[in-house]
Amino acid sequence: MSENPFDLTGKVAIVTGTSRGLGQYFGRALARAGADLVITSRDPATLAPFQAEIEALGRRALPLPLDVRSSDSIQAMVKAAISHYGKIDVLVNNAGCNVRKPALEVTWDDWNLVLDTNLRGTFFVSQAVARHMIPRKYGRIINIGSVTCVAGYAGLGPYGASRGGVKQLTMSLADDWGVHGITVNCLAPGWFKTQQNAVMYENREWVEYLCDRIPLKRPGQPQDLNGAVVFLASDASAYVTGQTLLVDGGISTGATRALPKKVR
């Protein structure tokens, strides 16, 4: 074992949903810590630039197709990853989606899309990877959640429900697989600007409203997540499992939200 508990040299990490957004930041952070990667997307052709970026860091990156709503796709991805690397040490369940609508406008299909992707997908990818981790008595599973797992936001009903489910699932899987040396934790970002929500951050009034409610007075930057994902993927977190780590600038405290602005 390295003297540096955050060192991931020799580890293999799967990061789902790496065609854009936070998934790529998670992948970069793990690669810089020494891990080789499996990167996934429903269309693996979109992964070529990211693959090249990881390889430029001196790490390996295997691009694979993955639709987390398909059992066959999940099984094929895990089989290909093990065939290529021989093992899986770390899983980052990042693939997800959102439908932002008032509750009365949410359709049956909207609900199924979000829950099938964010919750069911997280479970069945974890299950498939755990089948390989259990005989090796080692594994780090990181489920990507959201501040919506602890706070309610209008227009995010299905999304919040899915992330709340991921938080609960994390605790259940941690209890189930801890005996096998597998830790399962949830990394829950707060409000971060990504390609998916960039249009929201063009509204200055909304950004001011948001920052007024964040104790650190700014939205998150993707690099703010680097330390958390490396911590949860590494031996530094060997005795941490079943936990949800909120990286949200403190917005989940609700404290500044309750005070008049002039008091703050």
Q: What is each of the regions a protein language model found here?
A:
Residues 12, 19-21:
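Conserved glycine-rich cofactor-binding loop
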Residues 102-103, 107-115, 141, 210:
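Substrate-binding pocket helix/loop in short-chain dehydrogenase/reductase
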Residues 123-126, 138, 218-247, 252:
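C-terminal substrate-recognition "lid" of short-chain dehydrogenase/reductases
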Residues 126, 162, 170:
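Active-site helix of classical SDR
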Residues 131, 175-176, 238:
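Alpha-helical segment proximal to the catalytic Tyr-Lys
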Residues 146:
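Residue(s) in the substrate-gating loop at a strand-loop-helix junction
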Residues 178, 183, 240-242:
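Short, small/polar-rich loop/turn modules that mediate ligand/substrate recognition or access, typified
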